């Protein structure tokens, strides 16, 4: 593991997620095999109501990862013209199915469909991506709940690379229910002092330069540059923005900040693989409650 020093450094450490994700998947594979021997086959269901190709690619990657680890993964494609009623009915059906242990509602959704409203139909004990408002409320209250997997991946990466949090300053850029807000809550639970920045924040760099840990999750490529960071900062780049040549870039200008921060997650190969691994881990945790006594 890599320890990030608390003092300034001229070398930026790469905080990769591939090794961590591999370890989580190995644990998932072992647990899935044990559950299967006990008559419980872990099953994840992903509800899709879009023809967006990037979304389809992501869902297929989850299905492949699940299969490699011994989980079943059902892709429930309702079509891009699915109604709110049909999506809600499917989520309710899956929530009531004892053979299903994890449910994900994939975005984007058809026009007029409200994600939070629909996610409320996911049974909290199967809400492996922390989408149900009840799950988010329990997370904010410090009660047991599945955190959104991407937000959980941020904390898992920080722990894996032994980045201290208690008493440190955390700055989160972005306030979505998927990453920004839950990441801030998780940092608070680890005794960090947290600031959340958003589109109306004045003088963004004034806030981000104070960060010991900077989490960026807004979907704007190159938003964070050298002027926004300090040498002691550890930067977690959650952005995954497609490029014209088929690649991915983050919300952080890697060229600009490299050598100017203590640590930086790569895109791809940082938060992404850990997110997928944690979705499978959450599904295993849910399935374990179905284990025959």
UniProtKB/Swiss-Prot annotation:
GO process terms (BP): L-histidine biosynthetic process; methionine biosynthetic process; purine nucleotide biosynthetic process; tetrahydrofolate interconversion
Enzyme Commission (EC) number: 1.5.1.5, 3.5.4.9
Protein name: Bifunctional protein FolD 1
Alphabetically ordered keywords of this record: Amino-acid biosynthesis, Histidine biosynthesis, Hydrolase, Methionine biosynthesis, Multifunctional enzyme, NADP, One-carbon metabolism, Oxidoreductase, Purine biosynthesis
Listed GO CC annotations: cytosol
Protein's UniProt keywords contain RNA-binding: no
GO molecular function, one term: methylenetetrahydrofolate dehydrogenase (NADP+) activity
Family to which this protein belongs: Belongs to the tetrahydrofolate dehydrogenase/cyclohydrolase family.
Record's subunit section: Homodimer.
Residues given in the record as NADP(+) binding sites: 174-176, 240
InterPro entries: Aminoacid_DH-like_N_sf, NAD(P)-bd_dom_sf, THF_DH/CycHdrlase, THF_DH/CycHdrlase_cat_dom, THF_DH/CycHdrlase_NAD-bd_dom
Native source species: Saccharopolyspora erythraea (strain ATCC 11635 / DSM 40517 / JCM 4748 / NBRC 13426 / NCIMB 8594 / NRRL 2338)
Function: Catalyzes the oxidation of 5,10-methylenetetrahydrofolate to 5,10-methenyltetrahydrofolate and then the hydrolysis of 5,10-methenyltetrahydrofolate to 10-formyltetrahydrofolate.
Catalysed reactions, as listed in the record: (6R)-5,10-methylene-5,6,7,8-tetrahydrofolate + NADP(+) = (6R)-5,10-methenyltetrahydrofolate + NADPH; (6R)-5,10-methenyltetrahydrofolate + H2O = (6R)-10-formyltetrahydrofolate + H(+)
Tree of life domain: Bacteria
Known pathway: One-carbon metabolism; tetrahydrofolate interconversion
């Amino acid at each position: 593991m890599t320890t990030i020093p608390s003092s300034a450094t001229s070398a930026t450490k790469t905080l990769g997620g591939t090794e961590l994700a591999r370890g989580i998947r190995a644990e998932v594979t072992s647990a899935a095999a044990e559950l299967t021997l006990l008559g419980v086959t872990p099953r994840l269901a992903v509800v899709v109501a879009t023809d967006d190709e990037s979304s389809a690619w992501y869902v297929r990657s989850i299905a492949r990862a699940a299969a490699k680890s011994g989980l079943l993964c059902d892709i429930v494609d309702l079509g891009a013209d699915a109604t709110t009623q049909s999506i809600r009915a499917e989520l309710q059906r899956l929530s009531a199915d004892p053979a299903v242990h994890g449910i994900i509602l994939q975005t984007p959704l058809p026009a007029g469909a409200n994600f939070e409203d629909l996610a409320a139909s996911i049974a909290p004990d199967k809400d492996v991506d922390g989408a149900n408002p009840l799950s988010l409320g329990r997370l904010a209250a410090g009660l047991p709940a599945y955190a959104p997997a991407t937000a959980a991946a941020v904390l898992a990466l920080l722990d894996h690379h032994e980045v201290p949090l208690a008493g440190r300053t955390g700055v989160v850029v972005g306030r979505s229910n998927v990453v920004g807000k839950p990441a801030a809550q998780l940092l608070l639970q680890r005794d960090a002092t947290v600031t959340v920045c958003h589109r109306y924040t004045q003088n963004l760099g004034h806030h981000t330069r104070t960060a010991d840990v900077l989490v960026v999750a807004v979907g704007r490529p190159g938003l964070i540059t050298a002027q926004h960071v300090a040498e002691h900062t550890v930067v977690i780049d959650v952005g995954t923005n497609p490029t014209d040549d088929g690649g991915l870039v983050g919300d952080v200008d890697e060229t600009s900040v490299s050598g100017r921060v203590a640590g930086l997650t790569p895109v791809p190969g940082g938060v992404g693989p850990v997110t997928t691994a944690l979705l499978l881990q959450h599904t295993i945790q849910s399935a374990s409650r179905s284990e025959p006594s």
